[in-house]
């Protein structure tokens, strides 16, 4: 599947701003601690993508922006990055929306994926190296289920195939939840704990046998379509192998999605862990509730753009909140970010400004500490204020260098 065009990223050492390669520290849900990432020459990251029936709301945008920062910090540190993102282009919510609106599910998915690409391009999100739809990955998914079956980790309930969580001794490590905590979340987030015939209420669907009126694909275990969690297991290990550096997504994916996909991969390969770190973004709310498709309380990037918002102001509005925080979008976020963007743009157009080396060092330091983007923005604010006031030492190279820092590390074009 085609992703979207990559924005050019300035090379800061070439711009005269070399700096120590600070190790990126991220909060790992599995351990509950902020730990250094220690990638090899090529950092490997998998981020769960959209189910394309309502793209792109600000909750989506905040998540992909957070992992865009991860990508940029690693690249600034001299790493190559192999970034994989999926698209769940066949799943119950998509099929239900298509039926409700009288659309062909493929046309709905194609339209929403195209809109998502446009939004990611406008927000200057670095594209994944592998952008993989569930439909195109069905051969990989079938192979994964066959591997699980060869290890005795598949059973049937009325033609549907399930994964027994008892097959993975590490089940529960990703989320750290108890069974009592898992059960209601499993029911709320696409699971079927009440289904009769399952060995454990938490066992996850691997393959849904063909139903009338639903799309299906041939497989060694009969026509049907894949479950949600095994999709990401198959795609991630095919492109990244096991023990890749970061698996990411919204905090509502920690359980069951990341928990289940890790167990599938670990049992299928006999290796642990699926990912070295599980990194999750907070929820963006509106009117006191999480912004979500099911609730319908969505603010869309495309609507903000259509109403005249500068995409860089939208990006700054999101960067002003720490990626792990739960926060509420209000009518003040965008005007505040627009004013900040205008100040920064005015400052970098000056013939000289305070030296940029300290700005680069501070922004790098803040981002290395669990992506503290809000503090990084304050660093640039201080420089812009001093530059506009004509205060302190003046360096004619500084405005262009600060523009490069803001572009390379924060992804904001000034």
UniProtKB/Swiss-Prot annotation:
Keyword terms: ATP-binding, Ligase, Metal-binding, Nucleotide-binding, Zinc
Annotated signal sequence range: none
Domain of life: Bacteria
Catalytic reaction annotation: 1D-myo-inositol 2-amino-2-deoxy-alpha-D-glucopyranoside + L-cysteine + ATP = 1D-myo-inositol 2-(L-cysteinylamino)-2-deoxy-alpha-D-glucopyranoside + AMP + diphosphate + H(+)
Stretches the record annotates as Disordered: 1-38
Motif ('HIGH' region) on chain: 50-60
GO cellular component: cytosol
Residues annotated for Zn(2+) binding in this entry: 48, 232, 257
Co-factor: note: Binds 1 zinc ion per subunit.
Residues annotated to bind L-cysteinyl-5'-AMP: 48-51, 63, 86-88, 228, 250-252, 284
Record motif 'ERGGDP' region, residues: 188-193
Entry function: Catalyzes the ATP-dependent condensation of GlcN-Ins and L-cysteine to form L-Cys-GlcN-Ins.
HAMAP family attached to this UniProt entry: MshC (MF_01697)
Protein name as annotated: L-cysteine:1D-myo-inositol 2-amino-2-deoxy-alpha-D-glucopyranoside ligase
């Amino acid at each position: 599947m085609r992703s979207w065009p990559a924005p050019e990223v300035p090379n800061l050492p070439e711009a005269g701003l070399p700096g120590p390669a600070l190790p990126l520290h991220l909060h790992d849900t599995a351990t509950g601690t902020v730990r250094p990432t220690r990638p090899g020459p090529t950092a490997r990251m998998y981020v769960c993508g959209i189910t394309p029936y309502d793209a792109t709301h600000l909750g989506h945008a905040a998540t992909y922006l957070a992992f865009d920062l991860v990508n940029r910090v690693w690249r600034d540190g001299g790493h190559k990055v192999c970034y994989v993102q999926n698209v769940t282009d066949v799943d119950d919510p998509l099929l239900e929306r298509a039926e409700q609106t009288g659309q062909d599910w493929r046309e709905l998915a194609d339209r929403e994926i195209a809109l998502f690409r446009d939004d990611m391009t406008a927000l200057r999100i670095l594209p994944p190296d592998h952008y993989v739809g569930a439909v195109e990955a069905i051969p990989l998914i079938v192979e994964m289920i066959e591997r699980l079956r060869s290890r005795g980790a598949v059973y049937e309930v009325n033609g549907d195939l399930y994964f027994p969580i008892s097959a993975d001794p590490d089940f529960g490590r990703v989320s750290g939840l108890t069974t009592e905590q898992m059960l209601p979340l499993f029911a709320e987030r696409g699971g079927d704990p009440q289904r009769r015939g399952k060995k454990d209420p938490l066992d996850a669907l691997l393959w849904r046998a063909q139903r009338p009126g639903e799309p299906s694909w041939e497989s060694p275990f009969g026509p049907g379509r894949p479950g949600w969690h095994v999709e990401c297991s198959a795609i991630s290990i095919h492109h990244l192998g096991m023990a890749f550096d970061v698996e990411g997504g919204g905090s509502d994916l920690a359980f069951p999605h990341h928990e289940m996909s890790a167990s599938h991969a670990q049992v299928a390969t006999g290796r642990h862990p699926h990912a070295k770190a599980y990194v999750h973004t907070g929820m963006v709310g509106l009117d006191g509730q999480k912004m979500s498709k099911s609730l319908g309380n969505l603010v869309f990037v495309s609507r903000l753009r259509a109403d005249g918002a500068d995409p860089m102001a939208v990006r700054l509005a999101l960067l002003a909140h720490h990626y792990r925080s739960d926060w509420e979008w209000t009518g003040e976020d965008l005007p505040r970010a627009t004013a900040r963007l205008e100040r920064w743009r005015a400052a970098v157009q000056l013939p000289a400004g305070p030296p940029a080396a300290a700005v680069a060092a501070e922004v790098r330091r803040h981002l290395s500490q669990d992506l503290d983007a809000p503090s990084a923005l304050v660093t640039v604010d201080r420089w812009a204020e001093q530059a506009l006031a004509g205060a302190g030492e003046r360096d004619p190279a500084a405005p262009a260098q600060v523009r490069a820092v803001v572009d390379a590390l924060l992804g904001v074009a000034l």
